[in-house]
Amino acid sequence: MTVLMLIWMSYGPISIALSVVIFCILAVSLKFKSIFYRIVQFDILMNTVFYVNCITYKLKTIEEYHRVLLLIFESYPSLFILREGLSFWAYRFQCSSLLLKCIFRFTYAKYPFAAEIWKKHYRLIMVSTIFYSILLTIPFVFITKEHHGFDYYAFTMNIETVIYLLLTIYLGRLTKLSLKKRSKRFAESIKKLNNYIYCDLFIHGVAFFGVMIPKMLSFEWTEETKDYILTFTVDAINLASTYIIIICDSNLRKILFCHTKKLTTSVFQVSAVPVSKLIVSPQ
């Protein structure tokens, strides 16, 4: 097993399981009825799909699995097209989703009835976001990734990221102006949403300034090094929504850790039962 796979195994399966648990808690618990949590659920669901799709890229670093993958893709070309399509679509969707959350925060801050409108048209908004992000993905399919040592794909992604960054800053400014007209109590209630978006922006900022720009400018890096860096960057973005909501939401943390504590306690209680009581008497 390669070093890449060993590192991934240390956090990958746990993160997938945690994403499923968080998604279920948000769906079932009555404490999370707000439309904001439906958007977070949508994020977690799509990012988990993208994350699972990325596993096939990691498996190709192991020769045995690489041969199996090639055989599968040769037998079912549609699976290969689906994998490549999801990999192209992932970043477009994540940027669109980030912009969607900023729009939600702005409308929620400016219009008192915004939450009801979002709740009423939630499915339409989500479908529109998916459709919009797919349209944005189409041009990137035809962009040559690298030519004469210059990474055109990374360059185009950087331009795309700058555009989204400027849009989020602009919407943030409008939101701040709108909050001045609302009560302090309302401004306090929106703090959780602010923290979530700030963390999301931070992750995208690190990916942009710390990874994508150096990746594009560092011609002396080997392709293997670039692939490793890109793989873990993609993982960070795909897993961000799960860990961010845990960090930002105290109610979710209480439920999550309470369930964990109860599970641990019950395990110890079973172990502490006297042996005599575990023996079934003959009939």
Swiss-Prot record:
Keywords: Membrane, Transmembrane, Transmembrane helix. The keyword Translocase does not apply. It is found in: Membrane. The keyword Transmembrane helix applies. The chain crosses the membrane at residues 3-23, 35-55, 68-88, 124-144, 152-172, 201-221, 228-248. It is a multi-pass membrane protein. One of its GO terms (cellular component) is membrane. Its main location: membrane. GO terms for biological process: sensory perception of chemical stimulus. One of its GO terms (molecular function) is transmembrane signaling receptor activity. Belongs to the nematode receptor-like protein srg family. This is Serpentine receptor class gamma-46.
